[in-house]
């Protein structure tokens, strides 16, 4: 069992470079525990930190189906974790964009969401400038490079989602 990973385990761990948190956040998932239901928007609270109580267990994750969605990531070559990953989900109520690998925790890119809700095209994603102010700088990439990658990967995700 120790060699197996689960979606619930990945969400509970909330590694800042993990892929599943981006899917949960962009799709607007609901994390179901042994005692409550938590919207993804309220679940991820910081680096390796979630809204789970110490003795709370994830029992299910409910993912709404988007009209279109796609995930693109720029991988760290050694770990294959996301240096930056962007999940784009076009839903009936608008577009949600979640970014992983760039900050202390997965987050929504609201400027990209607004641009893509108005025009779901790669050009609209590329036209957005992302601030590096809240992004990570480490031995793998600067905050500025991560800020550059976010709209590039969002544009690729839109291309994939549009088929």
What are the language-model segments listed below?
Residues 1-163:
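C-terminal structural segment of proteins
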């Amino acid at each position: 069992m120790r060699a197996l990973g689960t979606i619930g385990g990945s969400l509970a761990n909330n590694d800042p470079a993990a892929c599943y948190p981006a899917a949960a956040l962009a799709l607007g998932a609901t994390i179901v525990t042994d005692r409550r239901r938590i919207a993804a928007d309220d679940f991820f609270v910081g680096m390796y930190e979630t809204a789970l109580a110490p003795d709370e267990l994830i029992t299910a994750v409910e993912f709404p189906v988007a009209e279109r969605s796609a995930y693109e990531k720029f991988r760290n070559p050694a770990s294959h974790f996301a240096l930056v990953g962007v999940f784009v989900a076009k839903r009936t109520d608008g577009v949600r964009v979640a970014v992983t690998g760039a900050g202390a925790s997965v987050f929504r890119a609201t400027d990209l969401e607004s641009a893509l809700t108005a025009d779901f095209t790669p050009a609209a994603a590329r036209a957005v400038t992302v601030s590096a102010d809240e992004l990570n700088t480490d031995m793998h990439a600067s905050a500025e490079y991560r800020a550059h990658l976010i709209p590039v990967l969002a544009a690729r995700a839109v291309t994939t989602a549009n088929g």
